[in-house]
């Protein structure tokens, strides 16, 4: 964290032109930011200023954003508030999870960084200030937040399933057991009481939400690996009978 005088001196002794940070997640003292001749830059996993802070990938899926990307920014004393040097984007597919987006951004980030470093070396990098009015705080995820509220819109729940995969995993209770949802789709249909199972077969477990129906396709019961709904119903059909109210 470069807080000690010894660490700061070691950094100064490097006589570095530039420092690059990736997924660092901590604020740097101004003295450290000023040590390299060209300052410090960071590879941030979103299109700034849309999502700042801890969980930009998950929040972009959760919010239903059409695209995400990486931003190479000049670091300042704030958290993800520095001037933008380069932005690279890619679409968020309707099947993308946080896990799949991490993999895509892990490829995009180094490419954008190399391009940005070339621009800096050539004196072509143009810093662009962020519009704070467009910024959102991508707070850390929690297990409590991942619990499904069946009164929510089905499309929103489906996005949460993808955003919270692989952690903390969207979940609900059935027969007093916590069930993790690995995959689901949503449908727009006339509905009854939220949380009610209206169909359960090899095609999925159909659950009424506040708006539409969520079709559960892959679940995980306590002590087991994630399984298809067909396999779940073969052994635990009583947990998911039509008319059952999930909580």
Curated annotation (Swiss-Prot):
Gene Ontology MF: a single term: methionyl-tRNA formyltransferase activity
Enzyme class name: transferase
Record family assignment: Belongs to the Fmt family.
Name of the gene: fmt
A Pfam family this chain is assigned to: Formyl_trans_C
Documented EC number(s): 2.1.2.9
The reaction(s) this protein catalyses: L-methionyl-tRNA(fMet) + (6R)-10-formyltetrahydrofolate = N-formyl-L-methionyl-tRNA(fMet) + (6S)-5,6,7,8-tetrahydrofolate + H(+)
Any one of the GO CC terms: cytosol
PROSITE patterns hit by this protein: GART (PS00373)
Keyword Protein biosynthesis found: yes
The protein, known as: Methionyl-tRNA formyltransferase
Source taxon at top rank: Bacteria
Upper taxonomic lineage: Bacteria, Pseudomonadati, Pseudomonadota, Gammaproteobacteria, Vibrionales
Functional description taken from the UniProt entry: Attaches a formyl group to the free amino group of methionyl-tRNA(fMet). The formyl group appears to play a dual role in the initiator identity of N-formylmethionyl-tRNA by promoting its recognition by IF2 and preventing the misappropriation of this tRNA by the elongation apparatus.
Keyword Amino-acid biosynthesis among UniProt keywords: no
SUPFAM superfamilies on file: FMT C-terminal domain-like, Formyltransferase
Keywords of the record: Protein biosynthesis, Transferase
């Amino acid at each position: 964290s470069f807080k000690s005088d010894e660490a700061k001196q070691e950094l100064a002794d490097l006589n570095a032109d530039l420092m690059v940070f990736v997924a660092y997640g901590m604020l740097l003292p101004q003295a450290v930011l000023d040590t390299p001749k060209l300052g410090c830059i960071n590879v941030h996993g979103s299109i700034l200023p849309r999502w700042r802070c801890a969980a930009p990938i998950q929040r972009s899926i959760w919010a239903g954003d059409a695209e995400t990307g990486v931003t190479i920014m000049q670091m300042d004393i704030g958290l993800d508030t520095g001037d933008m040097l380069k932005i690279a984007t890619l679409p968020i597919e309707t099947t993308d999870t946080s896990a799949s987006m991490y993999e895509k951004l892990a490829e995009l980030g180094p490419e954008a960084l190399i391009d940005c470093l070339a621009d800096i070396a050539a004196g072509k990098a143009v810093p662009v200030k962020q519009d704070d009015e467009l910024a959102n705080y991508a707070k850390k995820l929690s297990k409590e937040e991942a619990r499904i509220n069946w009164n929510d819109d089905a499309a929103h729940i489906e996005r949460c399933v993808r955003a919270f995969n692989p952690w903390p995993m969207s979940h609900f209770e059935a027969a007093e057991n916590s069930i993790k949802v690995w995959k689901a789709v949503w449908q727009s249909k006339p509905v009854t009481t939220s949380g009610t199972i209206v169909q359960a077969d090899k095609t999925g477990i159909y659950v009424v939400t506040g708006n539409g129906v969520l079709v559960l396709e892959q679940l995980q019961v306590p002590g087991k690996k994630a399984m298809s709904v067909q396999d779940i119903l073969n052994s635990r059909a009583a947990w998911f009978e039509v008319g059952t109210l999930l909580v």
